[in-house]
Every structure is written in C-alpha cells, then in structure tokens.
A protein has these predicted regions:
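Conserved alpha/beta-hydrolase catalytic His-Asp/Glu region
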Residues: 102-146
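Active-site catalytic motif of lipid deacylating hydrolases and related acyltransferases
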Residues: 1-41
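Active-site loop/turn elements of alpha/beta-hydrolase fold enzymes
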Residues: 20-22, 72, 184
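Glycine-rich phosphate-binding loop signature in dinucleotide/nucleotide-binding domains
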Residues: 38-41, 148, 203-205
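Flexible "cap/lid" loop of the alpha/beta hydrolase fold
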Residues: 60-107, 134-141, 163
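Conserved serine/cysteine hydrolase catalytic core
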Residues: 28, 132-194, 198
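Gly/Ala-rich beta-loop-alpha elbow adjacent to hydrolase catalytic centers
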Residues: 46-51, 55
Length: 205
C-alpha cells in the first residue's frame, strides 16, 4: 500500500518533512518555521497528534496556505495539549514519564492505544522507535492560533484511543474546519494513507 508521501509525490506535490526535537513547543515551532522558510511557494502545513499544536503556532508563516489536522490537537489561545486532553481524557492507558520529564506510550499498550488497525509487528516497531515528548512541550500554550486566520482541514479518527474522538470533533467544530471522519486508530495517517493524501490535496487547491 502506498503511503501518503508517495501518493502526494506521484501527484506532483513536493513534500518536506519536519523533525521536531519535541523538547518544547517553542523549539518545535521554530524547527517547523525553519523548514517553512526554505519553501518557495504556497505550502500546506500538516500535523498529527501533538503536531497539531506545532502547526497552530507555526502556521502564521507567510508560505502557509492552509492547515491539515490529522487526529491532532488544535489548541486555542492559552490552551495546551495537556489541558485539552485532561478535559476530555482518551480511552487509552495514561502516558508514562521518564525520570527527566519526557512522556511516552507504554510499549505494552501501544498496539491497542495507538495503532490498533495496523499489523502487530508494525505497531511494535513504532512502539520501540517512538520519540519521547517533553512535559514542557505538552504544557506549552498556544498564543496566536493560525487556524483563526487560515483555512483548516481535519481528520477525526473515530476509534482513537490516544485523543478522545469527541475532543477532536469539538475542536474542529470550534475552528470551523473542513472535517472528514475515518474509522481508524490514532495512526490514521498509516492505516488510511489515500484518504489523508486526498484531504491534503484538497487543502492545496
């Protein structure tokens, strides 16, 4: 099955991938803007999960045409992913924390809570390679949400156990995003690549 990057590339789009350090929300926004500054045309900014908070903060960049939230947090001013998630907790097990303040999904719960619609071997590899998220990033608050000024598109993953699907629906309704809903786990970008690519292409029009 083709992934979303392969589909977009085949359809003539150029794809750049940000590798945020996940040390703080400000650091991750800065890393994203660094990549955006290298673009030479209108850009669709896509974020999954915590990445939604990043694109909310980085989306004021002049290159950004629209935003796509893929089972992602979409904070308003003063909100963090911690405050949003705490208000409507997901069905999955609580995150674990390292001694130095980085959060991760218990590998034993990863398949069920993050990627239930993927093969076990693939989910287990993802569990072993997950990038830990600092508490500082999880508690960083939005200051000037880009979705208030630019068109936004969003995917609700109806079987999500990492973000409450009802929270996804309420955030996207609040922002008046163009929404699709897929019967998927939190790893919707992997289990439904064609649908995700189609929404990104729609956002690029």
């Amino acid at each position: 099955m083709e992934g979303r990057v392969e589909i977009l590339t085949k359809d003539g789009y150029r794809v750049s991938i940000v590798q945020p350090p996940e040390t703080s929300l400000d650091d991750d926004i800065a890393a994203t803007k660094r990549v955006l500054d290298a673009q030479d045309g209108p850009t669709v900014l896509v974020g999954h999960s915590y990445g939604g908070a990043i694109i909310t903060g980085a989306g004021d960049n002049a290159h950004v045409k629209s935003l796509v939230y893929v089972a992602a947090f979409q904070p308003d001013t003063g909100e963090s992913i911690a405050s949003l998630g705490g208000g409507r907790p997901p069905a999955g097990a609580p995150l674990k924390a390292s001694a130095d303040g980085f959060l991760y999904i218990d590998p034993a719960a990863f398949h069920a809570d993050f990627a239930a619609d993927l093969p076990a071997a693939e989910a287990n590899f993802m569990a072993r390679s997950q990038v830990l998220l600092s508490v500082k990033a999880a508690t960083g608050t939005a200051t000037s949400p880009a979705w208030k000024a630019k068109p936004s598109f969003a995917v609700v993953a109806s079987m999500d156990r990492s973000i409450n699907p009802d929270l996804e629906r309420s955030m996207y309704k609040r922002s008046n995003s163009t929404v699709i809903e897929l019967p998927s786990s939190h790893a919707v970008y992997m289990s439904h690549p064609a649908e995700i690519a189609a929404l990104i292409e729609r956002a690029a029009q």
